[in-house]
């Protein structure tokens, strides 16, 4: 599992961001994208054309969301952004004027970090962390193995060492839980079981057993609310969800579900790979599960080093490789992909091995 912040560092950053962030609901007709050489800023204007707030820098996520909202193809948007910022500003401003709407812009440290629907429900990291951390502290011997806050998400990954089993003799796994949240529209609040493998500190996220809450609420009108402040009172259903979050975290990976996943791991350990063409199987599996060629090469290396040419070995190679990537977000994706590989239908696994064998036979011929 990729190392992130300490819990103290995470708490400090969440608290800092809670004070530093600002949210606004605006009419898109009052937005202007302006270029200064290669740099772009977003202005929020009043009816007289004066700035309501200081011009804002724009983050990568917000750029993608602006392009999506205005139906500008992503590749073309990025080409204009890198090669002709003035052309991008002209395109964006034209479509903002022609397609008026109300949008929420989320700002942190003077930069637009998200460009969202005015129905976006702000269930922020501070609220989630405040709900779950006291519950984690109640679990005897609980360990916070890793946590992080990125531009995209907050993650808290905890392990309950009192709930553990051996997949094979000496290969011990422990139950845990992953809490994640996105404040920028890239995902719901998620609470997912985690399987932590002691032998190599791998984490595998069980992707089909999540408690989640989407960030969809009532529409906020720009004429009534320009700047949105921290909500001291949440809607009743949001309070109910936070209670559900606490209950899920308190269970810290329910014992029956943990036993079920361990059973899947034991079964996968007995399912062999086509050893005549291990690189071919890895390449096909990489394509099947959205892995890049370079990721596949790293996974192949860990698979060979692990001396376990089975379905279980492949899933572990993926989660082990997650520790090598620089992006914490991508590392967390790989922890989910590792489980998806473990849980793939046996018909898909058989097909991957058969196709690999056929390709090897064809190349030899």
Each PLM stretch: what is its role?
Residues 1-82, 164-363:
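Intrinsically disordered, low-complexity regions enriched in serine/threonine
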Residues 88, 154-158, 267, 271-275:
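Charge-rich, low-complexity amphipathic helices
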């Amino acid at each position: 599992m990729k190392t992130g912040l300490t819990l103290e560092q995470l708490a400090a950053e969440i608290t800092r961001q809670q004070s530093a962030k600002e949210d606004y609901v605006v009419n898109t007709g009052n937005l202007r994208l302006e270029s200064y050489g290669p740099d772009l800023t977003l202005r929020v204007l009043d009816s007289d054309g004066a700035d309501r707030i200081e011009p804002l820098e724009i983050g990568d996520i917000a750029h993608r969301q602006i392009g999506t909202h205005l139906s500008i193809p992503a590749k073309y948007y990025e080409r204009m952004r890198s090669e002709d910022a003035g052309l991008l500003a002209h395109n964006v401003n034209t479509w903002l004027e022609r397609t008026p709407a109300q949008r929420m812009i989320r700002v942190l440290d003077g930069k637009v970090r998200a460009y969202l629907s005015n129905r976006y429900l702000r269930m922020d990291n501070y609220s989630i962390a405040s709900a779950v951390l006291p519950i984690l502290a109640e679990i005897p011997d609980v360990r916070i193995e890793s946590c992080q806050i990125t531009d995209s998400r907050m993650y808290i990954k905890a392990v309950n060492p009192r709930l553990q089993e051996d997949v094979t003799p000496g290969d011990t796994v422990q139950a845990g839980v992953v809490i994640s949240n996105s404040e920028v529209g890239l995902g719901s609040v998620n609470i997912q079981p985690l399987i932590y493998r002691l032998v190599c500190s791998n984490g595998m996220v069980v992707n089909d057993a999540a408690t989640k809450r989407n960030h969809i609420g009532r529409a906020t009108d720009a004429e009534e609310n320009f700047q949105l402040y921290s909500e001291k009172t949440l809607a009743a259903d949001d309070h109910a969800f936070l209670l559900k979050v606490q209950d899920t975290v308190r269970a810290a990976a329910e014992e029956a579900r943990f036993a079920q996943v361990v059973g899947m791991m034991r079964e996968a350990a007995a399912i062999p790979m086509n050893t005549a063409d291990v690189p071919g199987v890895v390449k096909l599996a990489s394509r099947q599960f959205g892995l890049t060629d370079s990721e596949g090469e790293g996974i192949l290396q860990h698979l060979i080093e692990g001396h376990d040419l089975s379905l279980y070995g492949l899933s572990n190679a993926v989660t082990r490789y997650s520790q090598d990537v620089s992006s914490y977000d991508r590392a967390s994706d790989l922890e989910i992909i590792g489980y998806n590989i473990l849980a793939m239908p046996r018909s898909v696994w058989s097909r991957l091995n058969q196709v690999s064998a056929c390709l090897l036979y064809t190349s030899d011929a």
